[in-house]
């Protein structure tokens, strides 16, 4: 059972997924801090409120925080889209060459020999 788990864990797809999760978590922290500490204060200054995210609420519904989460999501989605587009262009899938069956090769050789006579 341990051997099967080792084979599963060391497959390329599982390792790629694990790396993607760790990188995604780290990237999410960067984007969250960008939105929280740079973008939202700028939006707050534009609308005349120092803390846009926390000050904007209506009947206890903090829609400022919701807007901040939406901006956070949009930035992550755009960055991931760009990353995937770049990765897809770098890793082009090679089209498999058409394999000719052995029978076809032999028949072609026989045909060529008969034509030569």
UniProtKB/Swiss-Prot annotation:
<keyword id="KW-0472">Membrane</keyword>
<dbReference type="GO" id="GO:0005886">
    <property type="term" value="C:plasma membrane"/>
</dbReference>
<keyword id="KW-0407">Ion channel</keyword>
<keyword id="KW-1133">Transmembrane helix</keyword>
<dbReference type="Pfam" id="PF01741">
    <property type="entry name" value="MscL"/>
</dbReference>
<keyword id="KW-0813">Transport</keyword>
<feature type="transmembrane region" description="Helical">
    <location>
        <begin position="30"/>
        <end position="50"/>
    </location>
</feature>
<keyword id="KW-1003">Cell membrane</keyword>
<keyword id="KW-0812">Transmembrane</keyword>
<comment type="function">
    <text>Channel that opens in response to stretch forces in the membrane lipid bilayer. May participate in the regulation of osmotic pressure changes within the cell.</text>
</comment>
<feature type="transmembrane region" description="Helical">
    <location>
        <begin position="64"/>
        <end position="84"/>
    </location>
</feature>
<feature type="transmembrane region" description="Helical">
    <location>
        <begin position="7"/>
        <end position="27"/>
    </location>
</feature>
<keyword id="KW-0406">Ion transport</keyword>
<dbReference type="GO" id="GO:0008381">
    <property type="term" value="F:mechanosensitive monoatomic ion channel activity"/>
</dbReference>
<dbReference type="InterPro" id="IPR037673">
    <property type="entry name" value="MSC/AndL"/>
</dbReference>
<comment type="similarity">
    <text>Belongs to the MscL family.</text>
</comment>
<dbReference type="InterPro" id="IPR001185">
    <property type="entry name" value="MS_channel"/>
</dbReference>
<comment type="subunit">
    <text>Homopentamer.</text>
</comment>
<dbReference type="InterPro" id="IPR019823">
    <property type="entry name" value="Mechanosensitive_channel_CS"/>
</dbReference>
<dbReference type="InterPro" id="IPR036019">
    <property type="entry name" value="MscL_channel"/>
</dbReference>
<protein>
    <recommendedName>
        <fullName>Large-conductance mechanosensitive channel</fullName>
    </recommendedName>
</protein>
